[in-house]
């Protein structure tokens, strides 16, 4: 993605030392200066961090989206690129986003978007994100909901553009129920337990 954007990538959230080593090795392999990848393990406010680092595109968590962080990014007026989960619109936080959000299912779609997006497009997307935030998630919306707590909030409309990927879903199910898939899950859980016991 850094190759395609020509900008910086700011990763907010924990990364293992092994992952950081892999990232640095990848940067060297492609001749990308290490200062174009910034790792911030923790911030109190994603919204403030996005503004402080002048981020113009937020690539949402994937394959499982993070709704709260998506709302913070939209509140900050930052354009959003959302991963379309192969069989759940809920897990991509698809319907929480604004109409016209950049959607991607495979890495090449994301790379193409990053390569083609110009400053004006990202600015317009950021403005659309901010409008969606004010319309659905702003403090006034919350205050109104709390003041009229007996009245149910209207459900937001489902956005157009989501279609499940049945082939990928079938592959996922096959991997999960096969012996190899079960062994892989057992191994990954054991590794996670071991890591958490050392923390």
Tell what function each PLM region has:
Residues 1-7:
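Short hydrophobic signal-anchor/transmembrane segments that target glycosyltransferases
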Residues 8-22, 38:
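Glycosyltransferase donor-sugar binding loop
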Residues 22-42:
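Nucleotide-activated donor-binding/catalytic signature segment of Leloir-type glycosyltransferases, i.e.
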Residues 23, 45-49, 70, 110:
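Acidic, amphipathic alpha-helical patches
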Residues 35-51, 65-66:
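Conserved active-site histidine-acidic residue motif and adjacent donor-binding/catalytic loop
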Residues 53, 57, 61-137, 148, ...:
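Catalytic binding pocket for nucleotide-activated donors in carbohydrate/polymer assembly enzymes
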Residues 111-199:
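C-terminal amphipathic helix plus adjacent low-complexity
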């Amino acid at each position: 993605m850094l190759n395609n954007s020509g900008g910086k990538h700011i990763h907010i959230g924990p990364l293992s030392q092994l992952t950081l080593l892999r990232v640095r090795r990848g940067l060297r392999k492609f001749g990308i200066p290490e200062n174009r990848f910034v790792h911030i393990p923790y911030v109190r406010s994603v919204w403030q961090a996005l503004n402080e680092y002048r981020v113009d595109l937020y690539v949402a968590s994937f394959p499982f989206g993070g709704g709260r962080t998506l709302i913070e990014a939209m509140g900050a007026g930052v354009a959003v690129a959302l991963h379309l989960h192969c069989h759940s619109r809920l897990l991509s936080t698809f319907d929480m986003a604004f109409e016209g959000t950049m959607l991607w299912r495979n890495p090449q779609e994301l790379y193409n978007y990053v390569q083609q997006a110009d400053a004006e497009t990202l600015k317009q997307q950021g403005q659309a994100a901010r409008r969606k935030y004010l319309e659905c998630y702003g403090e006034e919306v919350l205050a109104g909901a709390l003041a009229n707590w007996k009245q149910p909030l209207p459900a937001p409309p489902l956005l157009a553009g989501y279609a499940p990927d049945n082939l990928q879903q079938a592959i996922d199910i096959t991997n999960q129920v096969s012996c190899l898939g079960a062994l892989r899950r057992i191994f990954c859980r054991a590794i996670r337990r071991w890591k958490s016991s050392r923390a």
